[in-house]
Swiss-Prot record:
It comes from Avian metapneumovirus (isolate Canada goose/Minnesota/15a/2001). Homomultimerizes to form the nucleocapsid. Binds to viral genomic RNA. Interacts with the phosphoprotein P. When in a monomeric RNA-free form, interacts with the phosphoprotein (via N-terminus). Interacts with protein M2-1; this interaction allows the association of nucleocapsid with the matrix protein. Residues 136-153 have a biased composition (Polar residues). Encapsidates the viral RNA genome by forming a left-handed helical nucleocapsid that protects the RNA from nucleases. RNA replication depends on the availability of soluble nucleoprotein. The encapsidated genomic RNA is termed the NC and serves as template for transcription and replication. This is Nucleoprotein.
Length: 394
Protein backbone atom coordinates (compact mmCIF):
# COMPACT_ATOMS: atom_id res chain seq x y z
CA UNK A 1 0.00 0.00 0.00
CA UNK A 2 1.19 3.55 -0.67
CA UNK A 3 -0.24 7.01 -0.26
CA UNK A 4 -0.39 7.36 -4.02
CA UNK A 5 -2.47 4.22 -4.21
CA UNK A 6 -5.26 5.41 -1.95
CA UNK A 7 -8.40 5.83 -4.02
CA UNK A 8 -10.55 8.74 -2.98
CA UNK A 9 -14.14 9.58 -3.74
CA UNK A 10 -14.98 12.31 -6.24
CA UNK A 11 -15.17 15.42 -4.07
CA UNK A 12 -15.98 17.74 -6.95
CA UNK A 13 -19.26 15.87 -7.41
CA UNK A 14 -20.04 16.22 -3.72
CA UNK A 15 -19.20 19.92 -3.76
CA UNK A 16 -21.56 20.46 -6.69
CA UNK A 17 -24.39 18.93 -4.69
CA UNK A 18 -23.60 21.00 -1.62
CA UNK A 19 -23.46 24.23 -3.62
CA UNK A 20 -27.04 23.69 -4.76
CA UNK A 21 -28.30 24.16 -1.22
CA UNK A 22 -29.93 27.52 -0.58
CA UNK A 23 -30.14 27.01 3.16
CA UNK A 24 -27.90 27.21 6.19
CA UNK A 25 -28.09 25.41 9.50
CA UNK A 26 -28.52 27.39 12.69
CA UNK A 27 -26.62 26.05 15.68
CA UNK A 28 -26.79 26.78 19.39
CA UNK A 29 -30.15 28.53 18.99
CA UNK A 30 -31.14 30.12 22.28
CA UNK A 31 -27.73 29.64 23.87
CA UNK A 32 -26.67 32.59 26.02
CA UNK A 33 -22.90 32.92 26.40
CA UNK A 34 -21.31 35.68 28.45
CA UNK A 35 -19.60 38.54 26.62
CA UNK A 36 -17.51 41.05 28.54
CA UNK A 37 -17.02 44.63 27.28
CA UNK A 38 -13.53 46.13 26.98
CA UNK A 39 -14.29 48.53 29.82
CA UNK A 40 -14.01 45.61 32.27
CA UNK A 41 -10.68 44.32 31.00
CA UNK A 42 -8.81 45.32 34.16
CA UNK A 43 -11.26 43.43 36.37
CA UNK A 44 -11.17 40.33 34.18
CA UNK A 45 -7.37 40.48 34.00
CA UNK A 46 -7.18 40.57 37.80
CA UNK A 47 -9.51 37.57 38.11
CA UNK A 48 -7.30 35.64 35.67
CA UNK A 49 -4.30 36.50 37.84
CA UNK A 50 -6.10 35.38 40.98
CA UNK A 51 -6.81 32.01 39.36
CA UNK A 52 -3.08 31.56 38.75
CA UNK A 53 -1.84 33.06 42.00
CA UNK A 54 -3.51 30.88 44.64
CA UNK A 55 -4.53 27.26 45.08
CA UNK A 56 -8.26 26.81 44.65
CA UNK A 57 -10.63 23.92 45.27
CA UNK A 58 -12.64 24.56 42.11
CA UNK A 59 -11.24 25.52 38.69
CA UNK A 60 -14.33 24.68 36.67
CA UNK A 61 -14.82 28.25 35.39
CA UNK A 62 -11.15 29.11 34.86
CA UNK A 63 -11.39 28.70 31.09
CA UNK A 64 -14.58 30.75 30.92
CA UNK A 65 -12.80 33.62 32.64
CA UNK A 66 -9.96 33.31 30.14
CA UNK A 67 -12.43 33.56 27.27
CA UNK A 68 -13.94 36.67 28.85
CA UNK A 69 -10.50 38.26 28.68
CA UNK A 70 -10.49 37.37 24.98
CA UNK A 71 -13.84 39.13 24.73
CA UNK A 72 -12.46 42.30 26.32
CA UNK A 73 -9.52 42.43 23.91
CA UNK A 74 -11.58 41.86 20.77
CA UNK A 75 -14.47 44.01 21.96
CA UNK A 76 -18.02 42.95 22.79
CA UNK A 77 -19.49 43.75 19.38
CA UNK A 78 -16.73 42.00 17.48
CA UNK A 79 -16.98 39.00 19.79
CA UNK A 80 -20.70 38.67 19.08
CA UNK A 81 -20.02 38.97 15.34
CA UNK A 82 -17.40 36.22 15.47
CA UNK A 83 -19.84 33.93 17.27
CA UNK A 84 -22.50 34.72 14.67
CA UNK A 85 -20.10 34.13 11.77
CA UNK A 86 -19.24 30.73 13.21
CA UNK A 87 -22.83 29.69 12.56
CA UNK A 88 -23.95 29.97 16.17
CA UNK A 89 -27.26 31.72 16.83
CA UNK A 90 -26.36 32.76 20.35
CA UNK A 91 -27.69 35.62 22.44
CA UNK A 92 -24.87 37.31 24.33
CA UNK A 93 -25.30 38.41 27.94
CA UNK A 94 -23.02 41.29 28.93
CA UNK A 95 -20.87 40.93 32.01
CA UNK A 96 -21.45 43.45 34.79
CA UNK A 97 -19.97 44.24 38.17
CA UNK A 98 -21.55 44.43 41.60
CA UNK A 99 -20.42 45.64 44.99
CA UNK A 100 -19.49 42.89 47.41
CA UNK A 101 -20.70 45.00 50.32
CA UNK A 102 -17.88 43.91 52.59
CA UNK A 103 -14.17 44.53 52.52
CA UNK A 104 -12.22 47.19 50.67
CA UNK A 105 -9.28 47.23 48.30
CA UNK A 106 -5.89 48.88 48.91
CA UNK A 107 -7.33 52.23 47.78
CA UNK A 108 -10.12 52.09 50.34
CA UNK A 109 -12.76 51.44 47.70
CA UNK A 110 -15.51 48.85 48.02
CA UNK A 111 -14.64 45.56 46.37
CA UNK A 112 -16.27 45.13 42.98
CA UNK A 113 -16.94 41.58 41.76
CA UNK A 114 -17.63 40.39 38.22
CA UNK A 115 -21.07 39.04 37.42
CA UNK A 116 -20.32 36.69 34.50
CA UNK A 117 -23.31 34.91 33.00
CA UNK A 118 -23.04 31.18 33.67
CA UNK A 119 -20.47 31.60 36.45
CA UNK A 120 -21.74 31.52 40.01
CA UNK A 121 -21.06 34.69 41.98
CA UNK A 122 -19.94 32.53 44.88
CA UNK A 123 -17.21 31.02 42.68
CA UNK A 124 -15.82 34.44 41.73
CA UNK A 125 -15.96 35.61 45.34
CA UNK A 126 -14.18 32.50 46.59
CA UNK A 127 -11.37 32.87 44.02
CA UNK A 128 -10.91 36.51 45.02
CA UNK A 129 -11.01 35.67 48.72
CA UNK A 130 -8.42 32.89 48.42
CA UNK A 131 -6.09 35.06 46.33
CA UNK A 132 -6.24 37.93 48.84
CA UNK A 133 -5.63 35.51 51.68
CA UNK A 134 -2.61 34.04 49.90
CA UNK A 135 -1.31 37.53 49.09
CA UNK A 136 -1.58 38.62 52.73
CA UNK A 137 0.29 35.52 53.87
CA UNK A 138 3.02 35.96 51.25
CA UNK A 139 3.46 39.64 52.12
CA UNK A 140 3.84 38.74 55.78
CA UNK A 141 6.39 36.01 55.05
CA UNK A 142 8.49 38.12 52.66
CA UNK A 143 10.86 40.70 54.02
CA UNK A 144 10.11 43.04 51.11
CA UNK A 145 7.27 43.77 48.71
CA UNK A 146 6.19 41.09 46.23
CA UNK A 147 7.43 41.85 42.68
CA UNK A 148 4.73 43.13 40.34
CA UNK A 149 5.13 40.22 37.91
CA UNK A 150 4.38 37.77 40.73
CA UNK A 151 1.13 39.42 41.76
CA UNK A 152 -2.39 38.62 40.53
CA UNK A 153 -2.39 42.06 38.90
CA UNK A 154 0.52 41.15 36.63
CA UNK A 155 -0.43 42.41 33.12
CA UNK A 156 0.47 39.13 31.42
CA UNK A 157 -1.46 36.86 33.82
CA UNK A 158 -4.41 36.42 31.39
CA UNK A 159 -2.03 35.46 28.58
CA UNK A 160 -0.42 32.79 30.75
CA UNK A 161 -3.88 31.40 31.46
CA UNK A 162 -4.67 31.39 27.73
CA UNK A 163 -1.36 29.65 26.98
CA UNK A 164 -2.74 26.63 28.83
CA UNK A 165 -5.85 26.92 26.67
CA UNK A 166 -3.71 26.93 23.53
CA UNK A 167 -1.91 23.79 24.70
CA UNK A 168 -5.21 21.96 25.18
CA UNK A 169 -6.90 23.46 22.11
CA UNK A 170 -6.57 20.45 19.78
CA UNK A 171 -7.10 17.83 22.45
CA UNK A 172 -10.89 17.39 22.16
CA UNK A 173 -9.96 15.32 19.10
CA UNK A 174 -8.27 12.79 21.39
CA UNK A 175 -9.23 11.09 24.63
CA UNK A 176 -9.30 13.21 27.76
CA UNK A 177 -6.54 11.17 29.39
CA UNK A 178 -4.10 11.38 26.48
CA UNK A 179 -5.00 14.98 25.69
CA UNK A 180 -4.47 16.24 29.22
CA UNK A 181 -1.32 14.19 29.69
CA UNK A 182 0.24 15.68 26.58
CA UNK A 183 -0.84 19.25 27.32
CA UNK A 184 0.25 19.19 30.97
CA UNK A 185 3.61 17.65 30.13
CA UNK A 186 4.29 20.35 27.56
CA UNK A 187 2.95 23.14 29.78
CA UNK A 188 5.42 22.22 32.51
CA UNK A 189 8.17 22.76 29.96
CA UNK A 190 7.11 25.82 27.96
CA UNK A 191 5.60 27.68 30.93
CA UNK A 192 8.64 27.20 33.10
CA UNK A 193 9.07 30.95 33.71
CA UNK A 194 5.40 31.36 34.64
CA UNK A 195 5.63 28.46 37.09
CA UNK A 196 8.48 30.19 38.88
CA UNK A 197 6.43 33.37 39.18
CA UNK A 198 3.18 31.60 40.08
CA UNK A 199 4.28 28.40 41.87
CA UNK A 200 0.73 27.59 43.05
CA UNK A 201 -0.71 27.45 39.53
CA UNK A 202 -2.63 24.20 38.99
CA UNK A 203 -1.98 23.42 35.32
CA UNK A 204 -3.82 20.04 35.20
CA UNK A 205 -7.07 21.48 36.58
CA UNK A 206 -6.92 24.60 34.41
CA UNK A 207 -6.21 22.43 31.36
CA UNK A 208 -9.20 20.27 32.23
CA UNK A 209 -11.35 23.40 32.43
CA UNK A 210 -10.31 24.43 28.90
CA UNK A 211 -10.82 20.88 27.61
CA UNK A 212 -14.38 20.83 28.93
CA UNK A 213 -15.08 24.34 27.64
CA UNK A 214 -13.96 23.63 24.06
CA UNK A 215 -15.82 20.32 24.13
CA UNK A 216 -19.11 21.73 25.45
CA UNK A 217 -19.11 25.22 23.94
CA UNK A 218 -17.86 24.62 20.42
CA UNK A 219 -18.52 28.22 19.39
CA UNK A 220 -15.73 29.32 21.75
CA UNK A 221 -13.25 27.53 19.49
CA UNK A 222 -13.95 30.05 16.73
CA UNK A 223 -13.50 32.91 19.19
CA UNK A 224 -10.22 31.46 20.44
CA UNK A 225 -8.95 31.03 16.88
CA UNK A 226 -9.79 34.60 15.89
CA UNK A 227 -8.07 35.91 19.00
CA UNK A 228 -4.94 33.89 18.28
CA UNK A 229 -4.83 35.03 14.67
CA UNK A 230 -5.41 38.67 15.66
CA UNK A 231 -2.69 38.57 18.31
CA UNK A 232 -0.32 36.83 15.92
CA UNK A 233 -0.84 39.46 13.24
CA UNK A 234 0.45 42.21 15.54
CA UNK A 235 4.09 43.20 15.14
CA UNK A 236 4.47 44.05 18.82
CA UNK A 237 3.66 42.25 22.01
CA UNK A 238 4.95 41.10 25.37
CA UNK A 239 7.07 38.02 25.93
CA UNK A 240 3.99 36.15 27.15
CA UNK A 241 2.03 37.16 24.05
CA UNK A 242 4.83 35.93 21.80
CA UNK A 243 4.82 32.63 23.66
CA UNK A 244 1.05 32.35 23.28
CA UNK A 245 1.22 33.00 19.54
CA UNK A 246 3.93 30.36 19.17
CA UNK A 247 1.89 27.79 21.11
CA UNK A 248 -1.33 28.78 19.36
CA UNK A 249 0.07 28.47 15.85
CA UNK A 250 1.32 24.98 16.61
CA UNK A 251 -2.00 24.05 18.22
CA UNK A 252 -4.06 25.67 15.46
CA UNK A 253 -1.82 24.03 12.93
CA UNK A 254 0.27 20.99 13.50
CA UNK A 255 -0.90 19.85 16.91
CA UNK A 256 1.37 18.21 19.43
CA UNK A 257 1.30 14.65 18.13
CA UNK A 258 3.49 15.63 15.17
CA UNK A 259 6.39 16.41 17.49
CA UNK A 260 8.41 19.43 16.37
CA UNK A 261 8.30 18.32 12.76
CA UNK A 262 4.77 19.49 12.22
CA UNK A 263 5.65 23.12 12.92
CA UNK A 264 7.42 23.48 9.60
CA UNK A 265 4.30 24.38 7.64
CA UNK A 266 4.37 28.09 6.83
CA UNK A 267 0.82 28.63 5.65
CA UNK A 268 -2.50 27.80 7.25
CA UNK A 269 -3.29 25.51 4.30
CA UNK A 270 -0.24 23.35 4.96
CA UNK A 271 -0.69 23.50 8.72
CA UNK A 272 -4.30 22.35 8.74
CA UNK A 273 -3.62 19.61 6.24
CA UNK A 274 -0.80 18.42 8.43
CA UNK A 275 -3.00 18.26 11.50
CA UNK A 276 -5.83 16.42 9.81
CA UNK A 277 -3.29 14.01 8.39
CA UNK A 278 -1.75 13.11 11.71
CA UNK A 279 -5.21 12.42 13.15
CA UNK A 280 -5.64 9.88 10.38
CA UNK A 281 -7.48 6.59 10.43
CA UNK A 282 -7.58 4.61 7.21
CA UNK A 283 -11.20 3.62 7.85
CA UNK A 284 -12.19 7.24 7.26
CA UNK A 285 -10.15 8.39 4.29
CA UNK A 286 -10.97 11.93 3.18
CA UNK A 287 -9.28 14.09 0.58
CA UNK A 288 -9.05 17.67 1.83
CA UNK A 289 -6.43 19.17 -0.43
CA UNK A 290 -8.89 20.08 -3.18
CA UNK A 291 -11.25 21.39 -0.55
CA UNK A 292 -8.60 23.71 0.85
CA UNK A 293 -7.58 24.84 -2.60
CA UNK A 294 -11.19 25.62 -3.46
CA UNK A 295 -12.44 27.10 -0.20
CA UNK A 296 -9.29 28.49 1.39
CA UNK A 297 -7.52 27.64 4.65
CA UNK A 298 -10.63 27.67 6.79
CA UNK A 299 -11.87 24.53 5.08
CA UNK A 300 -9.10 22.59 6.74
CA UNK A 301 -10.18 23.86 10.12
CA UNK A 302 -13.81 23.16 9.37
CA UNK A 303 -12.85 19.63 8.44
CA UNK A 304 -10.97 19.13 11.69
CA UNK A 305 -13.81 20.52 13.82
CA UNK A 306 -16.52 18.43 12.22
CA UNK A 307 -14.57 15.19 11.98
CA UNK A 308 -11.46 15.22 14.18
CA UNK A 309 -10.34 11.79 13.00
CA UNK A 310 -11.05 12.61 9.41
CA UNK A 311 -8.62 10.27 7.76
CA UNK A 312 -5.35 9.96 5.97
CA UNK A 313 -4.52 12.60 3.39
CA UNK A 314 -3.45 11.59 -0.06
CA UNK A 315 -0.58 13.91 -0.89
CA UNK A 316 0.42 12.28 -4.17
CA UNK A 317 -0.45 15.44 -6.08
CA UNK A 318 0.92 17.82 -3.48
CA UNK A 319 4.73 17.86 -3.81
CA UNK A 320 4.97 20.99 -1.69
CA UNK A 321 3.81 19.00 1.32
CA UNK A 322 6.93 16.83 1.40
CA UNK A 323 8.06 18.21 4.74
CA UNK A 324 4.61 17.80 6.25
CA UNK A 325 4.50 14.17 5.20
CA UNK A 326 7.88 13.50 6.75
CA UNK A 327 6.62 15.17 9.92
CA UNK A 328 3.57 12.95 9.96
CA UNK A 329 5.74 9.92 9.39
CA UNK A 330 7.82 10.95 12.38
CA UNK A 331 4.81 11.53 14.60
CA UNK A 332 3.30 8.21 13.59
CA UNK A 333 6.33 6.23 14.56
CA UNK A 334 8.66 5.90 11.58
CA UNK A 335 11.57 7.39 13.51
CA UNK A 336 10.63 5.35 16.56
CA UNK A 337 7.58 4.35 18.51
CA UNK A 338 5.81 7.51 19.67
CA UNK A 339 5.44 7.37 23.44
CA UNK A 340 5.34 3.59 23.28
CA UNK A 341 2.11 3.47 21.27
CA UNK A 342 1.78 0.89 18.52
CA UNK A 343 1.37 2.68 15.16
CA UNK A 344 -1.26 1.85 12.61
CA UNK A 345 0.71 -0.61 10.49
CA UNK A 346 -0.96 0.31 7.20
CA UNK A 347 -0.50 3.99 7.85
CA UNK A 348 3.06 3.33 8.97
CA UNK A 349 3.86 1.53 5.72
CA UNK A 350 2.16 4.16 3.57
CA UNK A 351 3.97 7.06 5.18
CA UNK A 352 7.27 5.18 5.10
CA UNK A 353 6.89 4.45 1.40
CA UNK A 354 6.04 8.04 0.60
CA UNK A 355 8.89 9.45 2.70
CA UNK A 356 11.33 7.17 0.88
CA UNK A 357 9.97 8.18 -2.52
CA UNK A 358 10.48 11.83 -1.58
CA UNK A 359 14.02 11.08 -0.55
CA UNK A 360 14.71 9.30 -3.82
CA UNK A 361 13.30 12.20 -5.85
CA UNK A 362 15.25 14.81 -3.86
CA UNK A 363 12.11 16.54 -2.62
CA UNK A 364 12.82 16.52 1.11
CA UNK A 365 13.98 19.97 2.19
CA UNK A 366 15.77 19.43 5.50
CA UNK A 367 16.82 23.06 5.76
CA UNK A 368 13.18 24.12 6.17
CA UNK A 369 12.45 21.73 9.02
CA UNK A 370 14.38 23.55 11.74
CA UNK A 371 15.52 20.24 13.23
CA UNK A 372 17.84 19.74 16.15
CA UNK A 373 21.05 17.88 15.39
CA UNK A 374 19.60 14.79 17.06
CA UNK A 375 16.44 14.91 14.94
CA UNK A 376 18.40 15.55 11.77
CA UNK A 377 20.69 12.61 12.49
CA UNK A 378 17.70 10.36 13.14
CA UNK A 379 16.10 11.39 9.85
CA UNK A 380 19.31 10.92 7.88
CA UNK A 381 19.91 7.50 9.41
CA UNK A 382 16.36 6.41 8.71
CA UNK A 383 16.50 7.54 5.08
CA UNK A 384 20.08 6.31 4.62
CA UNK A 385 21.40 9.71 3.59
CA UNK A 386 25.19 9.64 3.46
CA UNK A 387 27.61 12.52 3.82
CA UNK A 388 28.22 12.72 0.07
CA UNK A 389 24.56 13.01 -0.84
CA UNK A 390 23.50 15.09 2.12
CA UNK A 391 23.63 18.41 0.27
CA UNK A 392 21.03 17.13 -2.17
CA UNK A 393 18.46 17.46 0.57
CA UNK A 394 19.37 20.84 2.06
Amino acid sequence: MSLQGIQLSDLSYKHAILKESQYTIKRDVGTTPAVTPSSLQREVSLLCGEILYAKHTDYSHAAEVGMQYVSTTLGAERTQQILKNSGSEVQAVLTKTYSLGKGKNSKGEELQMLDIHGVEKSWVEEVDKEARKTMASATKDNSGPIPQNQRPSSPDAPIILLCIGALIFTKPASTIEVGLETAVRRANRVLNDALKRFPRIDIPKIARSFYDLFEQKVYYRSLFIEYGKALGSSSTGSKAESLFVNIFMQAYGAGQTMLRWGAIARSSNNIMLGHVSVQAELKQVTEVYDLVREMGPESGLLHLRQSPKAGLLSLANCPNFASVVLGNASGLGILGMYRGRVPNTELFAAAESYARSLKESNKINFSSLGLTEEEKEAAENFLNINEEGQNDYE
